[in-house]
């Protein structure tokens, strides 16, 4: 996932990404990959890198990729990684990069919960939530429209822009509407695979007990009660109604000795 701008093609993609981020053009998938890789590096740097447990990584990828196949952009090459950090969090970067901390994994009780958590992050990618922030915000972290345009011609400026965008996204998070949509669709994607959608409600209730209702992950996030209500509404709208599997024993077996 290293960010490299060498070569004529790569430089052209960076120029295109910078222009697209200025809001002048839609972001192509090649440009999305450049942005996603750069933001992914910021996540890795902030959260102590990848947790070196290949068996655990394979398991998370198996679950995540199964869920991603049911999402709105199933052809993206999704990559799932466990972060070596004890905080309770997960992140998504454009073009298919999904991260979950080992601290969050410790809170998960069954595979259905894991599938829904990954589905939440997959939704941010499939619905282009981060890209929407990049395109619609005209002064991300104080960067002007001219600065956005300059990123298309100078890889150094592009990297500085990515640094600023990553700081905003990692410190503040996405807005409430996008988070609620990710809860609703993430559960639906997991249910399509055959997981019990109610498992995610139990997961959110457990986090509410652990953190308190007003302690959202970021100040822009809805509280847990709002997220639970939105998730339950989404579950009621599933057609046909889904029950599905929890697979608690399988999760316990796969995580044994890994965390």
Predicted regions and their residues:
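A Zn2+-metalloprotease active-site environment signal
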Residues: 1-259
